[in-house]
């Protein structure tokens, strides 16, 4: 449940930042944008869109697609790095979940605030001692680096001169598009669905809400903005699916094997409870749990090798 709440808060924060940035560009009475954000971020992207649209004769729709692809390719390594860190921490947390079960059980059964606080402190200490991040390795730096690129292409797609009067495949880029809105909702739903693949059933039930948060948010934003911006989000949705496919079917399996190999070579130490009243019981249970998990993982690993040899 905590992971689900964390994901919802992170998505809400990302959307809030995006909405904040969309309001940073001022528009004069003539409908022309101005200000520091526009001059710094929007103008270079707008010039690039104009170059492809007019100087290369490709039209504004194709120009927005090309520039969006360029931007997304540039920031794709950052997105994958962010996914790698988050997935690595998630796999480590999944590995340690049985080891921390005695503490989690005390946390669930705590009858007083003091008992609950003591169990939470033990859990945080155990996670810290084993190099686990409380924030899942998400980190803000990759997101902050990506945001200027997102905002630049967003402003350029909306305010580049000539875009509002252009058409693309029968769509008026200066008007709202229900068609693009529906497609965008589907794309981001698929991306959310892919993110749940390979997740344990218990956690998947908790993450169900996340399958609808992003698509619904994108629908509200797409339906209220011109088709030129929706076209940018359409291409962004395709890249999000590509990134999620790489994360789910390439990164996660590799990281899962990496974590198992790490702790097979260097088994985690039994965590000793700081709770004097339950110190012996907790330590004994934790030690037994450690040994059982390590033995199980070694057995599974050897069985896999024998199967491959056979």
UniProtKB/Swiss-Prot annotation:
The keyword ATP-binding does not apply. InterPro entries: YidC/ALB3/OXA1/COX18, YidC/Oxa/ALB_C, YidC/YidC1/YidC2_Firmicutes, YidC_ALB_C. GO terms for molecular function: membrane insertase activity. It is a multi-pass membrane protein. One of its GO terms (cellular component) is plasma membrane. CDD domains: 5TM_YidC_Alb3 (cd20070). A lipid is attached at residue 24 (N-palmitoyl cysteine). Its main location: membrane. Residues 262-310 are annotated as: Disordered. It holds the Pfam family 60KD_IMP. Residues 1-23 form the signal peptide. The keyword Cell membrane applies. NCBIfam families: PRK02463.1, yidC_oxa1_cterm. This is Membrane protein insertase YidC 2. It comes from Streptococcus agalactiae serotype III (strain NEM316). The lineage of its organism: Bacteria, Bacillati, Bacillota, Bacilli, Lactobacillales. The gene is yidC2.
């Amino acid at each position: 449940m905590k992971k689900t709440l964390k994901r919802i808060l992170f998505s809400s924060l990302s959307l809030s930042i995006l909405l904040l940035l969309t309001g940073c560009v001022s528009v004069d009475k003539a409908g022309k944008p101005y200000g520091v954000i526009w001059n710094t971020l929007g103008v270079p992207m707008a010039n690039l869109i104009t170059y492809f649209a007019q100087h290369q004769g490709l039209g504004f729709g194709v120009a927005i697609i090309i520039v969006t692809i360029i931007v997304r390719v540039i920031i794709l390594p950052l997105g994958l790095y962010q996914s790698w860190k988050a997935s690595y921490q998630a796999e480590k947390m999944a590995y340690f979940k049985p080891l921390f079960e005695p503490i989690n059980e005390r946390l669930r059964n705590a009858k007083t605030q003091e008992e609950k606080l003591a169990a939470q402190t033990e859990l945080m200490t155990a996670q810290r001692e084993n190099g686990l991040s409380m924030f899942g390795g998400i980190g803000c730096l990759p997101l902050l680096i990506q945001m200027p690129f997102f905002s630049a292409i967003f402003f350029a797609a909306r305010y580049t001169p000539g875009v509002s009067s252009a058409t693309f495949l029968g769509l008026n880029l200066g008007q709202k598009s229900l068609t693009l809105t529906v497609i965008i909702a589907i794309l981001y739903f698929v991306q959310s669905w892919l993110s749940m693949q390979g997740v344990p059933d218990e956690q998947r039930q908790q993450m169900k809400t996340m399958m609808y948060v992003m698509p619904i948010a994108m629908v509200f934003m797409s339906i209220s903005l011109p088709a030129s911006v929706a076209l940018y989000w359409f291409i962004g949705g395709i890249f999000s699916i590509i990134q999620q496919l790489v994360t789910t079917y390439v990164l996660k399996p590799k990281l899962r094997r990496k974590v198992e190999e790490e702790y097979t070579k260097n088994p985690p130490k039994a965590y000793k409870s700081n709770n004097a009243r339950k110190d012996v019981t907790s330590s004994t249970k934790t030690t037994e749990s450690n040994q059982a998990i390590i033995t199980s993982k070694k057995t599974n690993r050897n069985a896999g090798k024998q199967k491959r040899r056979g």
